[in-house]
Amino acid sequence: MWKGIDVSDNQGKIDWSQVAAAGVQFAILRSVRRSGKADYQFAANLAGCRKYIIPVAVYKYTYATTEAQAQEEARQVIDLLQQRGMAAGTMVWWDVEDRNTLQALGRAKLTALIQAARTVIEAAGYRFGIYVGLYVYNEGWFDFNQFAAAPLWVARYYNNYNVMQFDTDPDQNKKPEVGRALWGWQYTSTGRVPGINGNADLDICYQDPAGMEETGTELGSIWCLSIADVWAESIAKAAAAAYPGCLVHKAAVLDVGGIEIWIASIADVWTQAQAEEAQRQFAALGVTGVVHNIRVIE
């Protein structure tokens, strides 16, 4: 059993060093908003997870009422993951819970919409899972049997919305029963975690979350696509300023003997394959970069 969190820009700016020190073992990040734009804190949250080697997946809260909308939502998620160099095989959780838009669609139609999103996500090489509140299962909003092979993450809050500290384990006797094995249980929306101001959703995972996205070749390391390997922080920042989302790191470059330099990274990723794919994609846009395996110092 592993303990983690799911977060969005509702939590504001998160101190991931404190989150990691608190023992958080995985994080599930909101990917795109209803507008189709990235969650305002997605880039910062992903960078924090990567820096502190917290396995990460993403979720999308769906509002789709037609198959075309479901497919478009799925493509928006894929575009974001690819822009951020997230590996094929990363888990995408399809969040099916909006009573106002989804329940009235009926069982058959909602089932078809979820299938439409699943097809797009899996065709892009990502894994697909379903998140629901227990009430969605109990009320039979869609045909769960059609998704028997998909991981299932279920919310059930048993503590009357009282504050729960992250280091307090939930009562396993209150785990939701859905007639099949659960990937995870979201057990409160009023959790408190060091490094996060206010409430956060707390989760239990019953399968090793390390496979949600791969890690670097050495404990504490990541791969990156660097557009500037320099000695001075100011030069790295100047290079990074030309590219939205480009991050500046002081890092030990493990693939060249651990030399410590400043890097302007246009893609922080878990694997060499991801970094090389980012290199190809940016090269097609006329942006050249060097792939490195690094340990971030600051």
Positions of PLM-derived features:
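Anion (oxyanion) recognition and catalysis
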Residues: 50, 122, 178, 242, ...
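Functionally critical loop-and-helix segments that line ligand-binding/catalytic clefts
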Residues: 1-17, 144-218
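Hydrophobic anchor at the start of a short beta-strand
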Residues: 56, 127-129, 152, 245-246, ...
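Substrate-binding cleft of extracellular glycoside hydrolase catalytic domains
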Residues: 1-25, 29-116, 122-124
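Short, charged, surface-exposed secondary-structure boundary motifs
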Residues: 37-39, 162-168, 257-258
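Catalytic domains of cell-wall/extracellular-matrix polysaccharide-remodeling enzymes
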Residues: 89-171
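Active-site-proximal beta-strand/loop segments in catalytic clefts of secreted hydrolases
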Residues: 5-10, 29-33, 59-64, 94-99, ...
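Acidic/polar low-complexity segments and flexible, solvent-exposed patches
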Residues: 216-298
